[in-house]
Amino acid sequence: QVFNRMVPVANADNRTGIPFDWQMNVLRSDELNAWAMPGGKMAVYTGMVERLQLTDDEIAAVIGHEMTHALLEHSKKAIGGQVLTGLGGSILAGAVGLDGNLVGVGTDLLATKPFSRHQESEADAGGVRLMAQAGYNPQAAISVWEKMNRAQGGSQVAILSTHPANNTRIEAIRRMLPEVMPIYHQNKR
């Protein structure tokens, strides 16, 4: 339901010149993770939703973040177009061709570098805008990161070293609220 409400907003924001075939997969795993690939194939792990007890608004924050990675083609811009990372910090990489099609998920998975801090910040900002346009409360993006902090016990695993600290992300989102809250109020259902 959240995903379906966000797809038209993401399509309107698509500046790639290529229509996306948005697809959401739910993966059974305790991991705190979600990811997207060029072209709009996405996954959210059940652990993300269940362990953090995410509301619809918070799920929209996660989906918006990942949609923005796809819309800005971050994984294509990463090393050889082969990188795929998740919001929760776990890395999931697959052989992604330049056309954005996933080739051989499963045994062909490999780990490479996560997105840059700049790309993560772009995905946070774009995701907050997308969720507001879809009528979801942007303040929920803050609560997702607060829940991530609690789930991680306030520490961040080494793999997150290229990601902005959760508190830095929270502050950046907080600074965006004057811009995005009116958009949310205009679109909320």
Positions of predicted regions on the chain:
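Solvent-exposed loop/turn segments at secondary-structure junctions
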Residues: 30-32, 48-51, 69, 76-78, ...
